């Protein structure tokens, strides 16, 4: 290997073998060094035991297990940067050209994918997609409109994803009123609703006091009460606000 030794002098030695991050690398070995040149040699030895002749490490310089290293793939000749720990112990540390072949061995990734399929399979066709920078993406194709989007697994588990194209469609007034009554019952009179756009306000009539109330339609369909119910001090408005709040808490616990 041809290392640039000038790199060593400009780096602070931060513990070598005693660095907790490096203990995993040195596990089962008697080699101890606080010199980054020695650490790099040992890292490359460990990497070659794991990956064999898949990669060229002539440009590799090791600092610690959470730092980036440079590796050249002997299959596609691509030079890429990867976190040292991932290169030794995770399929994410592979070159993109080998990634699709080895991802089937990543149990954690497959467990996550199975959860996503269980949640979304009735509305989307879900398929894995690996981008060139090794980010794991899921291709979500809407079964209604065939629109596709690529999202990270964490995004799909952290939100209730809806098709971007379908969610922008304007629903009819009758559909809006029907959905709203299922949510709010007879709290509002919807006779003044004439047009429904997701980001526009609709005119509602409060059946408690008879006042006209404006609210963004998509917020209304999410079950949110208008600000009108917060500013009104009387007991009737407060009771409705309390009941809606209790229903929201119960639904969150169930979900």
UniProtKB/Swiss-Prot annotation:
It comes from the Viruses. This is Uncharacterized protein L192. It comes from Acanthamoeba polyphaga mimivirus.
